[in-house]
């Protein structure tokens, strides 16, 4: 209940004045109704921000065949509904302990979900589907690291961990069996994120060329400008970048 979160907030602030309190809310937290009550998460004294499940849903929707326009609309809705400080402190997730592994979700079809529990427990993507899933996961990570918010990696996703629902998504880290190319890709994204302050606090603008399989947006701050383009389609796409 709100009263508990308020007490938790006050206790955390007494211990550490700049404590950050992130809530686990799967939906739009600005108008969340739970147990027949509208929650007051962002009205002061409760949550500083929340886990960005709407971003996760938008990423998977886009990479699994949805349109870039729908992705942009989903994110604009969250931006309009959330206070700016909340929006820029969102916990950007692609995988969590409550979801099937990102790599699995980006590679399986409906048929695999119909397998019995034992089948799902031992399932590994075949090479052709694994290659597709890895490409999609790299695109998902680019979006995760370049949208406003703090990118948060569920251990093992960066190493190519697979698994369906709990408990198959909670296996131990694959020490000695990591996908080294994927791991290097994530490390590079971490470096870029740490070096580019614009990714932390820059404005977000979706491009007019965002359409269909091409998602394009910009992060800008002062004289700094970053253009992010993600093409999930099977055809090469040219997109023009105007000079500052």
Predicted region positions:
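Small-side-chain structural scaffolding
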Residues: 19, 23-25, 133, 140-141, ...
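Short secondary-structure junctions
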Residues: 198-209
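Carbohydrate-binding surface patches
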Residues: 207-243
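Short beta-strand segments
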Residues: 22-24, 92-95, 154-155, 226-231
